[in-house]
């Protein structure tokens, strides 16, 4: 928990009181938030105990036409808007990091509760934002920052607060899931599948943040922080994208009864000192087709949680898009508004555990290696001996003969990442190994 002393109880404005909203950003998500608040205003007022009233909308260009919005609501001065006394809740859907950080901190320090959908902001500055919210005795909500419409932050913070979470693993990026699903279902290569995702609007003009795993890493940091009560930033998350996944990798996975997904994996484990530690990583992963996450297709997202008492749980749905994200944002607005009307405050950041964050080399998992090797007697024995010398046990070896060499697909038992990395470097130095085409990690069903 934060070190600040416990703030005084917020008694609330009282039933029937209006709750003033400042909306920062009016793009796809902001427009949908405004539409939902307008369309369902009466219903929301009953659920909250008082009406939501939009006091202003901060935009970058006030001259741009915006259908259905009163011009007097628009402003280019976000800081002046959040300082208004009739604003109770600030909704940040701008995007980016540094400017939103300044605005959100200013809002919290001004005594406004904040709802944000900005995963990059939360992953990079959660500690600073949480401390500011605690000091001002206001709420900081960010359900939409992780998986769009899928409720997972709330369940981890509240519903599973009495349990011991062992792992959180999920498909948290719709763009990469669409691409991998297209490769799996059509046999297309990565470039063609990315082009199709771009054509359909699932991928940005610059897809780097998605396909290289950075977006998923931000979300993994948030999930790990909540699940394990330890501050984790995106810099703590090992990150590897999907741009090197080939059609041959997909075909090999299918032949083995697996599928490839880009997963965010957060785990608590016992390290070599015998103490609890956590790891957070994002990378392409082979999943057995029997695993619940293997059936998550197209641009859908899902988060798979394992807890000591509750067992296995999965949260599934739309992880992106204007309306799904706006749904999660508005859910947070309702929660913050209830506290403004009736008093109280939502649970804040809980980082009492302060567990060490393991180096990626301490990760233990299974591996799938695809190699081109010389096709002659003794090669298999030579390579098997190398794996054994490095302390890595082999689960299966499959060889495909070709005209001038052989394709070797090796699956290991569980091994340390550091041991596997060292072994790969030794394999590259072997004259009998012509190429290492891919190294992909495996998860159990």
From Swiss-Prot:
<feature type="binding site">
    <location>
        <position position="58"/>
    </location>
    <ligand>
        <name>NAD(+)</name>
    </ligand>
</feature>
<dbReference type="InterPro" id="IPR005106">
    <property type="entry name" value="Asp/hSer_DH_NAD-bd"/>
</dbReference>
<dbReference type="Pfam" id="PF01842">
    <property type="entry name" value="ACT"/>
</dbReference>
<dbReference type="Pfam" id="PF00742">
    <property type="entry name" value="Homoserine_dh"/>
</dbReference>
<keyword id="KW-0520">NAD</keyword>
<comment type="pathway">
    <text>Amino-acid biosynthesis; L-threonine biosynthesis; L-threonine from L-aspartate: step 3/5.</text>
</comment>
<feature type="binding site">
    <location>
        <position position="150"/>
    </location>
    <ligand>
        <name>Na(+)</name>
    </ligand>
</feature>
<keyword id="KW-0915">Sodium</keyword>
<feature type="binding site">
    <location>
        <position position="119"/>
    </location>
    <ligand>
        <name>NADPH</name>
    </ligand>
</feature>
<feature type="binding site">
    <location>
        <position position="29"/>
    </location>
    <ligand>
        <name>NADP(+)</name>
    </ligand>
</feature>
<feature type="binding site">
    <location>
        <position position="143"/>
    </location>
    <ligand>
        <name>Na(+)</name>
    </ligand>
</feature>
<feature type="active site" description="Proton donor">
    <location>
        <position position="219"/>
    </location>
</feature>
<protein>
    <recommendedName>
        <fullName>Homoserine dehydrogenase</fullName>
        <ecNumber>1.1.1.3</ecNumber>
    </recommendedName>
</protein>
<dbReference type="GO" id="GO:0046872">
    <property type="term" value="F:metal ion binding"/>
</dbReference>
<feature type="binding site">
    <location>
        <position position="321"/>
    </location>
    <ligand>
        <name>NADP(+)</name>
    </ligand>
</feature>
<feature type="binding site">
    <location>
        <position position="29"/>
    </location>
    <ligand>
        <name>NAD(+)</name>
    </ligand>
</feature>
<comment type="function">
    <text>Catalyzes the conversion of L-aspartate-beta-semialdehyde (L-Asa) to L-homoserine (L-Hse), the third step in the biosynthesis of threonine and methionine from aspartate.</text>
</comment>
<dbReference type="InterPro" id="IPR001342">
    <property type="entry name" value="HDH_cat"/>
</dbReference>
<feature type="binding site">
    <location>
        <position position="321"/>
    </location>
    <ligand>
        <name>NADPH</name>
    </ligand>
</feature>
<feature type="binding site">
    <location>
        <position position="28"/>
    </location>
    <ligand>
        <name>NADPH</name>
    </ligand>
</feature>
<feature type="domain" description="ACT">
    <location>
        <begin position="368"/>
        <end position="445"/>
    </location>
</feature>
<comment type="similarity">
    <text>Belongs to the homoserine dehydrogenase family.</text>
</comment>
<feature type="binding site">
    <location>
        <position position="204"/>
    </location>
    <ligand>
        <name>L-homoserine</name>
    </ligand>
</feature>
<dbReference type="InterPro" id="IPR036291">
    <property type="entry name" value="NAD(P)-bd_dom_sf"/>
</dbReference>
<dbReference type="GO" id="GO:0004412">
    <property type="term" value="F:homoserine dehydrogenase activity"/>
</dbReference>
<dbReference type="InterPro" id="IPR019811">
    <property type="entry name" value="HDH_CS"/>
</dbReference>
<dbReference type="GO" id="GO:0050661">
    <property type="term" value="F:NADP binding"/>
</dbReference>
<dbReference type="InterPro" id="IPR002912">
    <property type="entry name" value="ACT_dom"/>
</dbReference>
<dbReference type="InterPro" id="IPR016204">
    <property type="entry name" value="HDH"/>
</dbReference>
<dbReference type="Pfam" id="PF03447">
    <property type="entry name" value="NAD_binding_3"/>
</dbReference>
<keyword id="KW-0479">Metal-binding</keyword>
<dbReference type="InterPro" id="IPR045865">
    <property type="entry name" value="ACT-like_dom_sf"/>
</dbReference>
<feature type="binding site">
    <location>
        <position position="148"/>
    </location>
    <ligand>
        <name>Na(+)</name>
    </ligand>
</feature>
<comment type="pathway">
    <text>Amino-acid biosynthesis; L-methionine biosynthesis via de novo pathway; L-homoserine from L-aspartate: step 3/3.</text>
</comment>
<feature type="binding site">
    <location>
        <position position="204"/>
    </location>
    <ligand>
        <name>NADP(+)</name>
    </ligand>
</feature>
<feature type="binding site">
    <location>
        <position position="119"/>
    </location>
    <ligand>
        <name>NADP(+)</name>
    </ligand>
</feature>
<keyword id="KW-0486">Methionine biosynthesis</keyword>
<dbReference type="GO" id="GO:0009088">
    <property type="term" value="P:threonine biosynthetic process"/>
</dbReference>
<feature type="binding site">
    <location>
        <position position="215"/>
    </location>
    <ligand>
        <name>L-homoserine</name>
    </ligand>
</feature>
<feature type="binding site">
    <location>
        <position position="26"/>
    </location>
    <ligand>
        <name>NADPH</name>
    </ligand>
</feature>
<keyword id="KW-0028">Amino-acid biosynthesis</keyword>
<feature type="binding site">
    <location>
        <position position="146"/>
    </location>
    <ligand>
        <name>Na(+)</name>
    </ligand>
</feature>
